[in-house]
Design a protein with these regions (language model features):
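Low-acidity, Ser/Thr- and Arg-rich intrinsically disordered low-complexity segments
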Residues: 2-11, 18
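N-terminal secretory/membrane targeting signals
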Residues: 1-2, 232
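Periplasmic/ER-lumenal interhelical loops and adjacent helix-loop junctions
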Residues: 244-301
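Multi-pass membrane glycosyltransferase architecture that uses lipid-linked
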Residues: 16-252, 297-457
């Protein structure tokens, strides 16, 4: 050991053969994740121009059915339901009591837009959706995720105009904001945002548990109190006003849905159809298969889905962190849902795209993950809305399109899983160092290890 003045040992640089000493004056978040601090301002003007042009095309496709959507099924159908619910709410009716809602209570926030008319409500909804879209794009770029921002920019074109016509765009915004809050150690805000996402789509409740692995134990209480408090404040008033039975009926209806035609588990049912068996497709909360065969497949799907969630929780409880951060847990959970759920609506790919965009810049197979994500979006758009009628009317294209989509989903799941579990060394935590003992003053000596005198191989 040797002693040198504390004012000079930083300036002489690393000694031959020694490990680099981390700069203790730099915040841990900046040392560990320099890529996330690469951009102090928003995306350049050309990036915003590309974003705006793709959004203009998407909105025109949604509202006016321009090429190639002239004969495709309309993606705006749910917007009319939202407008009707908004009218009921503004008329003084109580959700879940006076009229039925098929979503959790978080949807009420978006029903609060003034329903001057159906057209005005749709314009308001799409405007808010575009704002959420822009905020996600800006947040991804500012956090140093350039590849993620590019992926998010092109995702609507690959998936189709349904991108802004469902509530999932707001779920994606809440998830991105929550992950960034965790990275910046704003755990209370992260809990509030994840609870908000849970109030629109139930599955983020599982993420609240998973991301505890990315939060220091001393901050768990603050995070969990914020999340549970938000859920209680949102649900208790509805229960007190008599909406409890309607809310429970809505949740039970979601749980008992059949196998949706876009699901991986729809493939054997399409095969049965092609073989001449009667397996009808019905329209309800979703477009799903019905009949005894579909019920058996749905039971298997539910079992596999539960096993997938248990697997995610097991990895969290055993400390097997994918990517060692909250974004990795989000992608792992989103992948499990897409792969194993009997309900796979196209809009689910909105928050899947957000999850990939958060991870892709630091993933071990980033480019490959981005490419397969785009392929998944395109394959999903082919099923809905482009070839929707071919899928539901029992034509010969149903089976090959379902098989193609299932193969892409499985391939995506494999790449995504390996991307968050095989993280390159440079993406991990920076090496730590025991603090040196300072004796007195700026020139007090500190003890540092001498370099290994043996030559470096």
């Amino acid at each position: 050991m040797a002693t040198i003045p504390s004012t000079s040992w930083r300036s002489i640089g690393p000694m031959p053969g020694s490990r680099p000493v981390p700069d203790r004056t730099t915040p841990v978040s900046e040392r560990d994740e320099p890529h996330r601090l690469a951009h102090r301002s928003g995306p350049p003007s050309l990036w915003w121009l590309g974003w705006a042009l793709l959004r203009l095309f998407g909105i025109l496709a949604l509202l006016h059915g321009i090429f190639p959507y002239e004969h495709a099924f309309s993606s705006s159908s749910d917007l009319y339901s939202y407008a009707q619910w908004s009218h009921d709410l503004w008329s003084g009716l109580l959700p879940y009591h006076d009229f039925a809602l098929v979503y959790p209570p978080g949807v009420i926030v978006f029903l609060g837009l003034p329903p001057v008319s159906t057209g005005v409500y749709i314009a308001e909804f799409l405007s808010v959706a575009l704002v959420a879209d822009a905020l996600i794009f800006r947040a991804l770029y500012r956090s140093g995720r350039s590849l993620g921002a590019v992926l998010w920019m092109i995702a609507p074109t690959a998936l189709g105009p349904i991108f802004w016509a469902r509530l999932d765009i707001f779920v994606a915004a809440a998830l991105v904001a929550a992950i960034l809050c965790i990275e910046r150690r704003r755990y209370a805000w992260a809990g509030i945002l994840l609870a908000g996402a849970t109030l629109v789509k139930l599955w983020p409740a599982v993420l609240i548990v998973l991301v505890l692995r990315a939060i220091p134990r001393r901050s768990w209480r603050r995070f969990l109190l914020a999340a549970t408090g938000t859920l209680v404040v949102a649900v208790l008033p509805l229960m007190a006003l008599g909406g409890g039975a309607g809310l429970w009926h809505s949740l039970r209806s979601q749980a008992t849905r059949g196998v949706e035609y876009e699901s991986v588990f729809a493939l054997p049912l399409y095969a049965l159809q092609t073989a001449g068996h009667f397996v009808p497709i019905v329209f309800g909360l979703s477009v799903n298969f019905a009949g005894p065969a579909a019920d058996h497949v749905a039971t298997v799907s539910d079992a596999v889905f539960v096993c997938a969630l248990v697997f995610c929780l097991w990895r969290a409880l055993t400390g097997r962190s994918p990517g060692a951060d909250a974004a990795g847990w989000l992608l792992l959970l989103a992948t499990a849902i897409v792969l194993t759920s009997k309900v796979l609506s196209p809009q689910y790919l909105v928050w899947v795209s957000a999850a990939v965009a958060l991870v892709v810049d630091r993933a071990s197979r980033g480019i490959r993950l981005a490419v397969v994500t785009v392929l998944l979006l395109v394959a999903t758009q082919v099923q809905f809305p482009l070839e929707f009628y071919q899928m539901v009317l029992g034509t010969d294209l149903g089976l090959p399109l379902s098989a193609l989509h299932a193969i892409v989903v499985v391939f995506f799941a494999a790449i995504a899983y390996r991307s968050v579990t095989l993280v390159p060394a440079e993406a991990g935590p920076a090496p730590t160092m025991r603090p040196a003992r300072e004796l007195e003053g700026d020139l007090a000596p500190v003890t540092v290890p001498m370099a290994d005198p043996r030559p470096v191989a």
